Structures are given as C-alpha cells and as structure tokens.
C-alpha cells in the first residue's frame, strides 16, 4: 500500500455476488496468492496508474461447492509476448529496457500458480506490452454447511451468563 500511495496508484476493490460467506479452504494460500499478484500489479504499474480487484462467487453444479473468482487488472507496463510464455517458470524475469530496475526473484508467479493448483484452481491472464495485465484466478471451495448451525447456537446464548439467575423455582 505504501508503494502504491507513493506512486499515486489508485486501487479499486469490488465484491460482487457473494452468496456464501463461510467456506472451507486455505485462507493462507489465498492470501499469499493475492499478495503476490497485487505486489506485481503495484511493482509493474505506472505513476498515477490504476489497479482493479474484484471477487465474485460462481455457483457450482455440486450443491456443497462453489468457486470464487478473483480478478486483478492493472494499467502497468504489461508483458511482451515472449515473456508471457514463461511467466510461471521459476526465476523467469523480463529483462528488457527499464524492466531491469524492478527487483525480484522471479518466484512470485510460479509460487502463486502452484498454490492455486494445489487448491484445485486455475490462473489465466491477458497482457499487452505497454498497456497492462489482467489475471483471473478461480478457486473451488467447499461450502461450510454447518456454519448456520454454529451461528444459531451463538444466538441462543447471546454470550450472557446465567450465573445468579433462578431458573428452577
């Protein structure tokens, strides 16, 4: 966020059509993936650029499953067609012109792809050299069908103690 603020990069976040709020999956993996994608969106953006992030639920044919779609679109420098072929390979970096000024190990995208695939998801992208990149990540999640029951139990007690109450008279 600090680098985005210094470069005056605007970040817009939109949650659309999310039905199920309690899902079973790996929040740590999702966080790591999104951090890698957003880090690149900021790092390879332009001053006064823009990053658009969205999250949308895509219903599944299986009643206990759903898919979350994350989109990250930036107005950055984009990727050459040649680099797009190897963006998910370890240590791959684009070394053309001003790109060499961007520090990195070339591991962020391969790690993100591996984590997404471990969760049973997919990652695709479109990029235009000089115009920006859009990543689309789809990850399946199991719906926590028991969350409603746990919520009902919480509502019954309301967190109030029965200490000192005369229940049986």
For each of these PLM feature ranges, what is it?
Residues 6, 33-36, 82, 138-169:
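Disordered, acidic interdomain junction associated with two-component signaling
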Residues 79-93:
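Short conserved segment of the HATPase_c
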